[in-house]
Amino acid sequence: MINTNLKNYDPKIWKLIIKEKKRQESYINLIASENYVSSSILEAQGSCLTNKYAEGYIGNRFYNGCNIIDKIEKIAIKRAKKLFNVEYVNVQPHSGSQANFSVFNALLKPNDIILGMNLNHGGHLTHGSTVNFSGKLYKSFSYGVNKCGEIDYDALKYLSHLHRPKMIIGGFSAYSGICDWKYMRKIADEINAYFFVDISHIVGLIVAGIYPNPLKYAHVVSTTTHKTLGGPRGGLIISNCGNKKIYSKLDSSVFPGSQGGPLMHVIAAKAISFKEALEPKFFLLQKNILFFSKKMVKIFLKRNFSVISGKTNNHLFLIDLSEKKISGKEASNILALARIIVNKNTIPNDSQSPYITSGIRIGTPAIVKRGISIKYVIKITNWICDILNEPNNLIKIKKISKKIKKICYKYPIYNKI
């Protein structure tokens, strides 16, 4: 059973993996939270490291046979510390949500008050949504954006002093603006609250120095290792607060507080992604992510589409389709017919349900990682406009689909299809 070949042993799964690979290779991916990992990361994640249980931390495991595992985790931590210029790192969280849970569990007690960004205004489920642990275990309130589509800091300050949360949460999953981390920390200090920031979406831009870094102001920062960082799907907790008690609480909250054994094949892959992010070309990658995003917004505005806040300062932006008389769900499904993948997304004060939405979210990390040139990004953006202006024109959609496929062949992800 050990030395089996996937194709021969389980052809059903093998065929589906091949189909998914072909799908990824032949579609343009504009989902802001997705990216492509390197072949080195794929190799690490498919390695024998997946076999090893390693409960505990370096030098203090609950299983024998972890001497090599310790070295791998040590490398991951060392690289993360260098990348983020921090003194505390925990590379064990399985995901961003797990990382966030661990931070909450370390710094809060059940029913403590938290204040995070409204999910419908660009926040994340784990920032206080009532359908998530963060809104069930804790008493959550939310701040949002103003009429200009930017964070309403006056409301944030008012709500902070009104409810006096134990923690203020910064970060987002669908917000295209710049966050004033310094001012948010000032508000937190005024009410003696923790300031916790989730940089999952903007982590790559931050380490490249082209988006404000919250580490100087936040007590704790969490992130995923995919998205703009371009690594494996996983979580990370970092801090420069200098409080050893907080560091100890965070470690205990990850293990044994919320997880058992770490995923060592993923931690090895994280280490590789940190090495990749330390290379000079990573800065150019992030620079293009921002440049492509801004360029696309300009085209959408020129084509009379409504962009939330009218601009972007990161890798993503939201298109308000209310005036186009098409829902986000319909738009994303129609664009998929043309081999263009986006996701439906709620917009501030959306009249539609989260399952339908009035908007779509567009992001540039994957097309930049793939190496697609700005010339084709401009064409793709205009094609999106053409399709959304004539969603029932199946002939046009079919023609665009063929053009997209040609571009995909020109820019393969891993190899020729």
From Swiss-Prot:
Its job: Catalyzes the reversible interconversion of serine and glycine with tetrahydrofolate (THF) serving as the one-carbon carrier. This reaction serves as the major source of one-carbon groups required for the biosynthesis of purines, thymidylate, methionine, and other important biomolecules. Also exhibits THF-independent aldolase activity toward beta-hydroxyamino acids, producing glycine and aldehydes, via a retro-aldol mechanism.
Predominant place of localization: cytoplasm
PANTHER family: SERINE HYDROXYMETHYLTRANSFERASE
SUPFAM superfamilies associated with the record: PLP-dependent transferases
E.C. designation(s): 2.1.2.1
GO molecular function: glycine hydroxymethyltransferase activity; pyridoxal phosphate binding
Organism: Buchnera aphidicola subsp. Cinara cedri (strain Cc)
Essential cofactor(s): pyridoxal 5'-phosphate
Protein name: Serine hydroxymethyltransferase
Family classification: Belongs to the SHMT family.
HAMAP family, per the entry: SHMT
UniProt site positions, description: Plays an important role in substrate specificity: H226
GO BP, sorted A to Z: glycine biosynthetic process from serine; tetrahydrofolate interconversion
Positions carrying N6-(pyridoxal phosphate)lysine: K227
Chain sites annotated for binding (6S)-5,6,7,8-tetrahydrofolate: L119, G123, H124, L125
Keyword Amino-acid biosynthesis annotated: yes
Gene3D superfamilies: Aspartate Aminotransferase, domain 1, Type I PLP-dependent aspartate aminotransferase-like (Major domain)
